[in-house]
Design a protein with these regions (language model features):
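Hot-dog-fold acyl-thioester-processing enzymes
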Residues: 2-86
């Protein structure tokens, strides 16, 4: 596991960001995405696809369990960025 940043990297401009290609700019603490969070996201978005919410069917699928929605993962970016960079 990567430890969260001790001191965040300060990026003043987009131009200065280009010079840091390939560098780790920030890390955040791990975030656990449990089934309750997935189910709540499914309710909020109306996306009840089986791979996300049907544990029995998903157990027979390619991942052996349910998986988080891609948009759920994307929706965590503000939380993760805040934890890593502020």
């Amino acid at each position: 596991m990567t430890e969260p940043n001790a001191a965040p990297v300060h990026i003043a401009t987009l131009a200065s960001l280009a010079g840091r290609v390939g560098e780790v700019l920030a890390t955040s603490p791990w975030v656990t995405i449990d089934q309750q969070r997935i189910d709540l996201f499914a309710q909020a978005t109306g996306d009840h696809q089986w791979i996300h919410v049907d544990r029995e069917r998903a157990a027979q699928g390619p991942f052996g369990t349910t998986i988080a929605h891609g948009f759920l993962t994307l929706s965590l970016l503000p939380e993760l960025a805040n934890a890593a960079m502020v």
